[in-house]
Amino acid sequence: MSDTTLFRTPVETPRTCHPIQPQDGCILLGSCFAQEMGNYMNAYEMDVLCNPTGTLYNPASISLLIHHALRNTAEEDLPVFTNNGKWYCWLAGTQLSGNSKEEITIMMKEKLSLLKAALQHASHLFITLGTNICYRLKEDNSVVTNCHKMPANIFTESALSVEECTDTLLTMTNELLSWNPHLGITLTVSPYRYAKYGFHKNQIAKATLLLAVEEVCHTRSEVSYFPAYEILLDELRDYRFYAEDMLHPSPTAVAYIWQRFCQSYMSEQTRQYLREYEQILKGLTHRPSHPDSPQHKAFIANLETKREELRRKYGLQK
């Protein structure tokens, strides 16, 4: 046994046939783990859109948002509501709120238009599924993305079956590919553990999602799977790689999975761009002793020049 595998069992992460080029547009939707990967891509100034309406957790919520984005029109009514003087939308997280129905509607339509345009031109879409638990409004049985701390008695909670998850994801995939036939879709299951449902129920949820994703990938060759869940649970496999809450992956684990993600989905040219940009990031995040000194200002100006040269070199837009 080699030294590199002595204390771990490596999870295979096959290389994609359609790797991300430096100038490619990418979309990340789903749980907080999607946000973690999106944060890395944003830090390297890649063309990425991540959860424009907030965090999403289950296949039904993600599919519903995509459907509304692709069918977004000025005339379409959105599921908005008011609480304590503020207006919210059942398709979005709590960070999107307005002082009137008109304001929240305009905000949501702008976000949906942003997502629609991105889906039309993006080369890659990454969807991270967190759970199969779904919440619906009792009054009309409609799916909600976020409960917005509203009374529990206005919702019903249900666990989507493997068949329901599969059908939902396949319908979503068909709709996406009819809109953008060149879109590469990657599904992954979040390694975050949903303790609020109990660990047994969490495992059932993850198993349900994994079985559904397997069926979708088998049915549609355009869809691939990235094993973030397996990397944390089967390869890293240690509480050292969890945050203080023992539920979220630690920054070290996220960084490791990011590296594995890059190996699988980034082209050699993109990985070279990331390596070169890393040097600029180190300079930009350096804490100087005298930030107002002429020397430091010249240092920052030089970094900005290198940054612009690097972006032009790899064909990245501003």
Kindly give the residue locations of the regions a language model identified.
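Extracellular glycan-modifying ectodomains
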Residues: 1-318
